């Protein structure tokens, strides 16, 4: 995974545009009734960025570990929430956490940058660090977004593309069935949202570890 992209290009731009305080309109709130979000839990915000969802879970009394590949994003997060535990992590490598460490692993638009082999390994790692009965909650880009990106991507493997030096995976239901086969589905919804004034075609999901 390209560490330089996230430090030099992505967060260089979006640190100026994102709002860490805006936590009440986050999509996960619509599913609070399904995951007992007010019960104190050990949460991993995997691919946390600057930490909007970290703050969301902290505000509800959870113990949160925030992990990202970007040193710049983690420095910003630590400056704004000094008490949070941060771990720099490349998700194409084994996760730096203990077996059965977390009640919730949360990954907002952060696991769709990997090849089939890397994605398979990542989901196995997420299952490893989740407690039995723990929740894997997140979102990924949908294959319905292909029409918006087809003119500037090169296909590397099925549903996996290079976009100007950055890899991106687009997900459909079959991929959830394959990669998440050892998890129990609670929620799987395809949605269209607006992000930074652009249309975002994505899946929202909640799965439960066995």
Explain the meaning of each model-derived region:
Residues 95-105:
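A short acidic, Gly/Pro-enriched loop at the edge of an enzyme's catalytic core
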Residues 45:
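Class I SAM-dependent methyltransferase core
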Residues 1-39, 49-94, 137-209:
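Class I (Rossmann-like) S-adenosyl-L-methionine-dependent methyltransferase catalytic domain
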Residues 116-117, 149:
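Conserved catalytic-core motifs of eukaryotic protein kinase domains, centered on the activation segment
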Residues 112-114:
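A short His-aromatic
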């Amino acid at each position: 995974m390209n560490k330089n992209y996230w430090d030099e290009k992505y967060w260089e731009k979006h640190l100026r545009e994102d709002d860490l305080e805006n936590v009440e309109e986050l999509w996960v709130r619509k599913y609070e009734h399904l995951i007992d979000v007010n019960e104190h839990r050990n949460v991993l915000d995997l691919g946390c960025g600057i930490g909007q969802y970290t703050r969301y879970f902290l505000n509800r009394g959870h113990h949160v570990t925030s992990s990202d590949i970007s040193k710049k994003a983690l420095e910003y997060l630590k400056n704004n929430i000094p008490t949070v535990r941060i771990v720099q992590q490349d998700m194409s490598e084994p996760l730096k956490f203990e077996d059965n460490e977390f009640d919730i692993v949360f990954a907002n638009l952060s696991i769709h940058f990997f090849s089939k082999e890397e994605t398979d390994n990542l989901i196995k790692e997420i299952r490893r660090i989740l407690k039995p009965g723990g929740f894997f909650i997140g979102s990924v880009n949908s294959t319905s977004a292909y029409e918006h990106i087809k003119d500037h991507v090169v296909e590397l493997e099925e549903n996996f593309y290079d976009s100007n030096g950055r890899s991106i995976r687009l997900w459909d239901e079959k991929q959830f069935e394959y990669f998440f086969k050892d998890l129990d589905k609670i929620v799987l919804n395809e949605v269209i949202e607006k992000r930074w004034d652009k249309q975002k075609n994505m899946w929202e999901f909640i799965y439960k570890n066995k």
